[in-house]
Amino acid sequence: MKLIASHCVFPTPDIQKTTEFYVEKLGFRRVEYLDAKEKHICLYRDRVELILTQANSQRIYPNRELYGYGEDAYVITECQQELQDEFGQKGVKIVRTLHKTDYNNLEFTIEDIDGMWICFVIKQSLYFHDFVLSTLK
């Protein structure tokens, strides 16, 4: 038995407004489940899925506010400069430009419409790189 994938679940104060941001600014497509018992919207781009849920409050607290640091999601990617340029051209707030971290990842971070920080990363671990390549075949 092995684990296959993981999805981020983001509560949001305005599920439609947040969905529009992800579709228009980040290039995701949406699938709505608003008639389901637990209403949600799934967002897809390439092999990434994010799930939005309607929050019971008008304010969302990202990890950095709750715990002092940290992004709210890591998305493994490639062609980061192109992706950062794409987001920048669409007016997405880039809070950390593309850089190499002290743990040898290449990453940049954006802030979504609700204040969540999403990091787009290329992990430098050879094991991880080989694993990702093997799953794409």
Label every PLM stretch briefly.
Residues 14-15, 78-80:
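Helix N-cap motif at beta-to-alpha junctions
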Residues 12-15, 102:
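Conserved beta-strand-loop-alpha-helix junction that forms the acyl-donor binding cleft
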Residues 1-7, 29-78, 84-111, 122-137:
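Vicinal oxygen chelate
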Residues 18, 22-23, 87, 115:
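Conserved active-site tyrosine of GNAT-family acetyltransferases
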